[in-house]
C-alpha cells in the first residue's frame, strides 16, 4: 500500500505549490478526526475556504498560513529534495519547513514529510502505543527563546527522524 499510494501522493504533491498545500491541508484536517471523513472535509474547504465548517481553532491559522506561504514552502521543499544533502539532512530540513506551519507538531510534520517526500513518518497516538514511546518526547517548545531551547527542539526533531 505504501509503495503504491504514497508514491502517487508524492508525485501529486511535488507537481505544484497548490498540490503541496492540498496535501498539508489533508494532514491538518486529519487531526483528531476519523480518517474516513477527511475527503468530505477537503471538498468542503476547497469550496468554502475560510468559511468551511471544518476549519476551526488552529486549523484556521494553518489554512491561512498555507494560503499565504505555499509558494515559498514549495520552493524550499523542492530545493531540499533536489539538493545533494544526505537523507538525514533532507529529512531535518523538511521537518523544519513543516514545523513552521501553525498547528503542526512533530507527528503531523512527519506525516507531511512521508506523503510529500517519502521520508520520516507519522508517529501518531496509535503508533505511540504500538511502539511504547513517551508522548512527552514528541512535544516541542512552541516558542523557544534561548539557544538551549532551540537546541532541545532540534534534538527532539532529529530523534524523531531516527
Residue ranges and their predicted role:
Residues 88-138:
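Catalytic DNA-binding helix-loop module of base-excision-repair DNA glycosylases/AP lyases
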Residues 22-34, 63-68, 114, 162:
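Short, hydrophobic/amphipathic alpha-helical patches that form generic packing surfaces
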Residues 2-11, 15-17, 82-86, 92:
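Catalytic phosphate/metal-binding cores of nucleic-acid and nucleotide-processing enzymes, i.e., regions
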Residues 10-24, 30, 51-59, 159-162:
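Structural motif
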Residues 22-26, 49-50, 94, 109-113:
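Short, flexible active-site loops
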Residues 33-102:
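Alpha-helical ds-nucleic-acid-binding substructure associated with the helix-hairpin-helix region
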Residues 16-20, 30-34, 103, 119-122:
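Short, contiguous, pocket-lining structural segments
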Amino acid at each position: 500500500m505504501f509503495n503504491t499510494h504514497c508514491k502517487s501522493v508524492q508525485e501529486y504533491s511535488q507537481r505544484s505549490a497548490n498540490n503541496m498545500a492540498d496535501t498539508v491541508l489533508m494532514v491538518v484536517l486529519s487531526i483528531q478526526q476519523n480518517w474516513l471523513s477527511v475527503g468530505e472535509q477537503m471538498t468542503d474547504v476547497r469550496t468554502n475556504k475560510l468559511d468551511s465548517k471544518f476549519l476551526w481553532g488552529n486549523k484556521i491559522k494553518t489554512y491561512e498560513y498555507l494560503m499565504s506561504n505555499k509558494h515559498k514552502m514549495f520552493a524550499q521543499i523542492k530545493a531540499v529534495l533536489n539538493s545533494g544533502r544526505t537523507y538525514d539532512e533532507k529529512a531535518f530540513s523538511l521537518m523544519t519547513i513543516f514545523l513552521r506551519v501553525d498547528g503542526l507538531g512533530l507527528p503531523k510534520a512527519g506525516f507531511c514529510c512521508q506523503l510529500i517526500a517519502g521520508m520520516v513518518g507519522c508517529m501518531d497516538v496509535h503508533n505511540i502505543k504500538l511502539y511504547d514511546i513517551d508522548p512527552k518526547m514528541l512535544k516541542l517548545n512552541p516558542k523557544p527563546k534561548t539557544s538551549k531551547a532551540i537546541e532541545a527542539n532540534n534534538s527532539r526533531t532529529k530523534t524523531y527522524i531516527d
